[in-house]
């Protein structure tokens, strides 16, 4: 892997003017397992990590490049940080609204260079969490200034296929620009009014208020939960439980042991859906919020595209969330939560199957609209992964079984 990474550095470094090169190094979940153990018996995880990073830094040094490294693994253990070269710029990322300031202090106390790295909080969402993004960027900037960080990197990324459209990240980038330049306590509402005017030409200042409500008020079945439900199956059509995904979901739920490994995928999906039944039951209220917010934004846009936002993109993403809200409700019915959900028709299962089939078709048609938006600004990349999620759920709906 070192030889491969070094070849990538040799190929990519000449393409950029910058003398700084980010070697990554974050979230090394499999370190100390498999081949890394076989190749270095007796080495600790700290030593395995530090040795690999030092080798990459040596490759960069031969080209006169300055290494940058995501700081999360080094911060897990002070010994790891001690083993790393002193000339690395640490990229200290924290993406939650409530940050852990001590992580910034730890790097500063070692005299190391660091950038603070907040996020626009768009991953695994049809619309970003704008409220959380504002708090995250503001608090990271304030803490970075306090402990002498040399700069800030605002991150925008996606999980599970990157369903989030980068054009919707413009407000988050504006938050980052404001806070990197001058992190003063500005009310979030005031900042949103400024962005409404500056980025979207809305002199009333209210467009961002409607956009910011979408993620908080309009989501009953979020993209990440949908993908977790889907990926609980090991392979396609096997009915077997993916124990790695099951363990990840349990860790995400505070370590609660939710799944019986002996009962397979369908039982695990049922348990996960029923655990989230209160959220899934909010579908009707969420859909009303989506329609209200979308109508308000479209009225301001008045048929034009501003700041990368256009009415068609807006409705494609809103309709995607509305369809996934309906999907969550139908999956809850299949999980046995129909009484709580109130969607099972008194005429029986045949009409339920008809309703599910219509939703399956609506999801497939929606994806074609989404595909047009995706390809209007980029190449195929991860689009096939999103297609797999949509088409797999369409199959489940038509089959009528988890």
What kind of feature is each model-predicted range?
Residues 2-20, 27, 38-402:
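Substrate-binding groove of N-acetylhexosamine-processing glycoside hydrolases
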Residues 32-33:
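Surface-exposed loop and adjacent secondary-structure segments within mature catalytic domains
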């Amino acid at each position: 892997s070192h030889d491969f990474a070094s070849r990538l550095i040799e190929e990519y470094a000449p393409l950029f003017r910058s003398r700084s090169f980010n070697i990554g190094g974050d979230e090394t979940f499999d370190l100390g397992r498999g081949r890394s153990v076989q190749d270095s018996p007796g080495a600790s995880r700290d030593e395995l990590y530090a040795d690999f990073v030092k080798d990459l830094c040596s490759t960069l040094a031969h080209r006169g490049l300055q290494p940058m490294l995501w700081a999360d693994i080094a911060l897990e253990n002070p010994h790891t940080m001690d083993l790393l070269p002193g000339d690395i710029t640490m990229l200290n990322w924290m993406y939650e609204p409530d940050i852990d300031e001590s992580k910034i202090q730890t790097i500063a106390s070692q005299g190391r260079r660091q950038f603070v790295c907040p996020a626009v909080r768009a991953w695994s969402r049809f619309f970003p969490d704008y409220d959380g993004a504002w708090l995250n960027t503001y608090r990271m900037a304030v803490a970075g200034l306090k402990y002498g960080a040399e700069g800030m990197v605002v991150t925008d990324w996606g999980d599970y296929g990157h369903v989030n459209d980068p054009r919707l990240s413009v407000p988050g980038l504006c938050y980052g620009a404001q806070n990197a330049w001058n992190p003063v306590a500005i009310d979030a509402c005031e900042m949103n009014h400024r962005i409404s005017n500056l980025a979207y030409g809305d002199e009333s200042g209210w467009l961002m208020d409607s956009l910011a409500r979408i993620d908080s008020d309009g989501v009953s079945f979020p993209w990440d939960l949908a993908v977790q439900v889907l990926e609980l199956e090991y392979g396609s059509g096997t009915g077997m439980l993916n124990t790695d995904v099951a363990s990840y979901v349990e860790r995400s739920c505070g370590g609660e042991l939710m799944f019986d490994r002996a009962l397979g995928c369908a039982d695990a999906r049922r348990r996960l859906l029923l655990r989230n039944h209160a959220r899934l039951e909010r579908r009707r209220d969420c859909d009303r919020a989506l329609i209200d917010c979308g109508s308000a934004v479209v009225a301001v846009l008045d048929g034009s595209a501003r700041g990368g936002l256009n009415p068609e993109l807006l409705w494609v993403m809103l309709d995607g969330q509305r369809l996934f809200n309906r999907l969550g409700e139908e999956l809850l019915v299949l999980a046995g939560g129909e009484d709580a959900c109130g969607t099972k028709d008194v005429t029986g299962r045949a009409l339920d199957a008809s309703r599910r089939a219509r939703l399956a078709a609506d999801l497939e048609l929606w994806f074609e609209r989404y595909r047009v938006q995706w390809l209007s600004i980029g190449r195929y990349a991860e689009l096939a992964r999103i297609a797999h999620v949509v088409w797999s759920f369409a199959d489940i709906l038509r089959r009528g079984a988890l």
